[in-house]
Amino acid sequence: MGKQINNTFTWVIKNLSTLQGLEVRSKIFVVGGCKWRLIAYPEVNDADGYLSLSVYLGVPDCCESLPSGWKRHAKFSLTIVNQLSEGLSQVQETQAWFDENAPGWGFPPMLNLKDVSDKYGGFLVNDEVMVAVAVDVIEVVGSLDAPEMSESMDIKGFKVLPSQVKSVNRLFESHPDIASKFSIKNQSLKTAYMNVLLCLAETLHQSPMEISEDDLSDAKTTLAYMKSVGFKLDWLEKKLDELFEKKKEEADKIRMQNIEEELKDLRQKCSSLEALLKKEKTGVLAAKAPFLFFNNVNDDDLKWILRAVMYTLIMMLFISI
């Protein structure tokens, strides 16, 4: 997930523990008419309490999209945000020429922590790391490969895009004290938090049918974190609880429908088995009927029956002669 305001781009790397030893790339963003991308290489070992993160700023698809001889000179800063204390964030700044031979620059590693208490001291929270980059393009050789971003506007101390002004104004009109306890001063981080808040509000205004269980779980984690940095979000918490309850009702309804279908199938199977059992019983009784008759006849009666049969046979023989 990544959000951009002017020359600042914020990237939240989720599920870091599952990305061990992999190259992780952000989405492409545009600064100074140039396309950029962040690249990270995480190393996480919970058993040993070890966290390492290398981060680079790079030019995406430079060989395919840019003309021969292209290069660009940029000054940039990379920040690994401490989500519990802004003052502990790790910041590195430099300037460099990006070209075909050196399309990426960064700091290996920016973060290298061992035996840090409280889940890596605020750098890794809910298995997420937040990285911010600010880029100032000094000089470009070759054509620009993307349009400029719109200028930002200031709303209650937060820098937002013109397209976000209406949404942010609506937030402060409906909830004037929403940021009354938000004390972070760094403008890049303030912008990043506002972007997260707008995304959270948008997510929680979906209908129960549109939003997934995973989205709700992520929203719950994000909401708790946003409250921890000073935002007053009781209204969003209420909305989240309502969505959880409606999703539960929806899940219960689906589960009951499934049970009813299974019960219907079982009843049909029982009915078929009862019919088969009745048929088998009828066949067994029919096969046993002659034996049941002779079982109920005593010896005298049996002698009489045999004599009658023999007499009948003799008479039939006599008649035939």
Swiss-Prot record:
Supply the InterPro entries for this chain.
Answer: MATH-CC_domain_protein (IPR050804), MATH/TRAF_dom (IPR002083), TRAF-like (IPR008974)
Entry keyword annotation includes Nucleotide-binding? no
In terms of SMART domains, this protein maps to:
MATH
Q: Which UniProt keywords apply?
A: Coiled coil
Cite the SUPFAM superfamilies for this sequence.
TRAF domain-like
Which stretches are transmembrane?
A: none
Query: Can you give the residue ranges of the MATH domain?
Result: 6-135
Where in this chain does the entry annotate a coiled-coil region? 232-283
Q: What superkingdom heads the lineage?
A: Eukaryota
The name on file for this protein is MATH domain and coiled-coil domain-containing protein At3g58260
* Organism of origin: Arabidopsis thaliana
